């Protein structure tokens, strides 16, 4: 790692510290992510190194470029392209927190493009949130940390003991499902969509049960009628309070009918009925035309 000069610490992610760094030879600015795991005593598992190395093949305008992976001395370093701001900081710094609706539409389309691309390569994110959506200052939004959950799992707490946010976590994960699909990312995108529109987190829970109950209070407590199989999930309780569904008018009043319809499809309880990223991009909300990042994208592989 001698080729990189650390400029400053720019964040502490789920798995380790992130530095802004400069390549001493080329002058290129990069984000240097130093992975620190509980299992560092015995080093980074070779499976994780393999998983992460595969991510170098994911090339798309709406996915942060992984430039290199360096594994040495029981540590793993990931070298990413450098972007200056994330969506959370951007929303926090604007006077009202919510974004203009044309910007919301552009960002949502780009997120769906990036997620659709990853899903077509059988990569699930599992931990999408505004903090790992990065902005380039030119209108593009890019997904960071794709694939890390599969390599390392999603811990309950970060290595600095901060709680990993539950706000964007799909109900099937909260209900203890060990088998989940690309639909978990679609749920997260629905939560992020609503937050971009209103400037407020849709379901800001502070524990798993609080998170579930916030979802239930808004979307109604799920039943076998609305989500076949829900009563068989490991953490489902028949004693859950029975809340009825709120209207979307209360939740996202400024969103037009097409936007509300798309949000409902992103936040379907039953994962098998949740809209896919590819289908969402064809939704009437995005017509006529929407602003997207450039379409030239390549992949070094077609399956995992």
UniProtKB/Swiss-Prot annotation:
Residue positions of the active site: 127
Record EC number? 2.7.11.22
Sorted UniProt keywords? ATP-binding, Cell cycle, Cell division, Kinase, Mitosis, Nucleotide-binding, Serine/threonine-protein kinase, Transferase
Pfam families named among the record's database cross-references:
Pkinase (PF00069)
Annotated GO MF terms: ATP binding; cyclin-dependent protein serine/threonine kinase activity; protein serine kinase activity
Gene3D superfamilies hit by this protein: Phosphorylase Kinase, domain 1, Transferase(Phosphotransferase) domain 1
Q: Which cysteines are joined by disulfide bonds?
A: none
How would you classify this enzyme at the top EC level? transferase
Protein kinase domain residues = 4-286
What PROSITE patterns does this protein's entry cite? Answer: PROTEIN_KINASE_ATP, PROTEIN_KINASE_DOM, PROTEIN_KINASE_ST
UniProt cross-references to SUPFAM superfamilies, sorted A to Z: Protein kinase-like (PK-like) (SSF56112)
Q: Name one GO cellular component term.
A: cyclin-dependent protein kinase holoenzyme complex
> SMART domains this protein is in?
S_TKc
Q: Which reaction does it catalyse?
A: L-seryl-[protein] + ATP = O-phospho-L-seryl-[protein] + ADP + H(+); L-threonyl-[protein] + ATP = O-phospho-L-threonyl-[protein] + ADP + H(+)
Residues bound to ATP: 10-18, 33
Q: Which family does it belong to?
A: Belongs to the protein kinase superfamily. CMGC Ser/Thr protein kinase family. CDC2/CDKX subfamily.
Function in brief = Serine/threonine-protein kinase that plays a critical role in the control of the eukaryotic cell cycle; involved in G0-G1 and G1-S cell cycle transitions. Interacts with CCNC/cyclin-C during interphase. Phosphorylates histone H1, ATF1, RB1 and CABLES1. ATF1 phosphorylation triggers ATF1 transactivation and transcriptional activities, and promotes cell proliferation and transformation. CDK3/cyclin-C mediated RB1 phosphorylation is required for G0-G1 transition. Promotes G1-S transition probably by contributing to the activation of E2F1, E2F2 and E2F3 in a RB1-independent manner.
Its assembly, as annotated, is: Interacts with CABLES1 and ATF1. Binding to CCNC/cyclin-C promotes RB1 phosphorylation. Binds to CABLES2.
The molecule here is called Cyclin-dependent kinase 3
The primary gene name is: Cdk3
């Amino acid at each position: 790692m001698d080729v990189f000069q650390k400029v400053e610490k720019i964040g502490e992610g789920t798995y380790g510290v992130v530095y802004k760094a400069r390549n001493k030879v080329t002058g290129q600015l990069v984000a240097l992510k130093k992975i620190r795991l509980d299992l560092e005593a015995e080093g980074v598992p070779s499976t994780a190194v393999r998983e992460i190395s595969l991510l170098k093949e994911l090339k798309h305008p709406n996915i942060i470029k992984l430039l290199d992976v360096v594994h040495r001395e029981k540590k793993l370093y990931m070298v990413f392209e450098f972007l200056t701001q994330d969506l959370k900081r951007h929303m926090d710094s604007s006077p009202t927190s919510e974004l203009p609706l044309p910007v919301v539409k552009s960002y949502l389309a780009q997120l769906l493009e990036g997620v659709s691309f990853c899903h077509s390569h059988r990569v699930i994110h599992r931990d999408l949130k505004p903090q790992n959506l990065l902005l380039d200052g030119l209108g593009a939004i890019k997904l960071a940390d794709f694939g890390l959950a599969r390599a390392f799992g999603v811990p309950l707490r970060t290595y600095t003991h901060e709680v990993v946010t539950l706000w964007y976590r799909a109900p099937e994960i909260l209900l203890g499902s060990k088998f989940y699909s690309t639909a978990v990312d679609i749920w997260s995108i629905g939560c992020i969509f609503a937050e971009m529109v209103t400037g407020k987190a849709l379901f800001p829970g502070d524990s798993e049960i609080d998170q579930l109950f916030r979802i239930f209070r808004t979307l109604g407590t799920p039943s076998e009628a609305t989500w076949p199989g829900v009563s068989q999930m490991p953490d489902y309780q028949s004693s859950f309070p029975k809340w009825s569904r709120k209207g979307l008018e209360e939740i996202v009043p400024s969103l037009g009918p097409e936007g509300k319809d798309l949000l409902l499809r992103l936040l379907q309880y039953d994962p098998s009925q949740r809209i896919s990223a590819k289908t969402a991009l064809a939704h009437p909300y995005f017509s006529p035309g929407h602003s997207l990042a450039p379409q030239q994208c390549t992949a070094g592989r077609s399956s995992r």
